Amino acid sequence: MKKLFPIIILFTSCASVTINPSILSPSNVEIPKKLHRLNIGLAQSRITTLEAVSSIIKQDEMFTIWERELEANIFDSGDEPMGYIDYKVIFNEVVPTEKGKRYFLITNLTFWIPSMVGYPIIEVEKIIEVEITIFNKKMKKINKYNIISKSEPGKLGLYNLYAVEANDMIATVAVTKDIIQIFKSRLESDVESINKQLEASFLSN
């Protein structure tokens, strides 16, 4: 039996998790009155350059979803941007839940023996906080939205640790989509005023 555990660990750790690219697709929920088209991001705020290959520019999943959602469901059909919209990530961490802290304590007090038969090592949740700021053409701030959301708790055990990276991506996508829906609901009551301010700045150039 003792020889069996390393074999199980080896095979489970070699397993892979397949993620369907469709999870990055925008929702099919448009806001009733659209926001005037804006430049997405300020300078390099929405892209990161890979260190290994400096010529490649990578957008991670949260900014991919954000850009697609803006284009599909938030911006109007105007050709020329009337300002800027910035999506700044303030906090993005996986943290243990209170139950997860108890799991971890029990696991360590029992020398990880229960985890060998499927007892969770820890339970965690993904928490993301963002600031979404809208600026006019002259870079004057019009409105700012601070939004926090978190994922459903997820348990980690000895035999699913291989899936941590994939699960983190799935949680990031879910939380980002929730943040965007919260933003859309708040924007609905402000969009008329924001559009008027964008128009005034744009026409005064």
Please report, for each region that a protein language model flagged, where it lies by residue.
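Surface-exposed short loop/turn segments
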Residues: 81-142
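Sec-dependent N-terminal signal peptides
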Residues: 3-12
